[in-house]
Amino acid sequence: MANREGGRRNSGKLRRAKRKVCAFCMDKSEFIDYKDINKLRKYVTERGKILPRRISGNCAKHQRELTRAIKRARNIALLPFTTE
């Protein structure tokens, strides 16, 4: 018969990943500056995509601010839209 667990071997021993803490909340930074390219590059992939919240670990408020800052930096050519 088919395995009802969906192929999982340790079905009863699921382990939750540790929740990442928002780096901007830890620093207690007032706002995210779009001119701080080194900080913004940590949250952009090699392909130029913005990392989602579940990967970056940011809170919702700072993820919105980060997205705005990255888009502003792209518009004034501080960050590239895509890689070459």
UniProtKB/Swiss-Prot annotation:
- Keyword Isomerase present in the record's keywords: the answer is no
Q: Which UniProt keywords apply?
A: Ribonucleoprotein, Ribosomal protein, RNA-binding, rRNA-binding
- Share what the entry says about its subunit structure, partners included: Part of the 30S ribosomal subunit. Forms a tight heterodimer with protein bS6.
Task: Kindly provide the name given to this protein in its UniProt entry.
Answer: Small ribosomal subunit protein bS18
Q: Which PANTHER family match?
A: 30S RIBOSOMAL PROTEIN S18 (PTHR13479), SMALL RIBOSOMAL SUBUNIT PROTEIN BS18M (PTHR13479:SF40)
InterPro entries linked to this entry: Ribosomal_bS18 (IPR001648), Ribosomal_bS18_CS (IPR018275), Ribosomal_bS18_sf (IPR036870)
Describe the task this protein carries out. Binds as a heterodimer with protein bS6 to the central domain of the 16S rRNA, where it helps stabilize the platform of the 30S subunit.
Pfam entry (one): Ribosomal_S18
Question: GO terms for biological process?
Answer: translation
Which ranges does the record mark as transmembrane?
A: none
Q: Which GO terms describe its cellular component?
A: cytosolic small ribosomal subunit
Q: Which family does it belong to?
A: Belongs to the bacterial ribosomal protein bS18 family.
> A GO molecular function for this record?
small ribosomal subunit rRNA binding
The domain of life for this entry's organism is: Bacteria
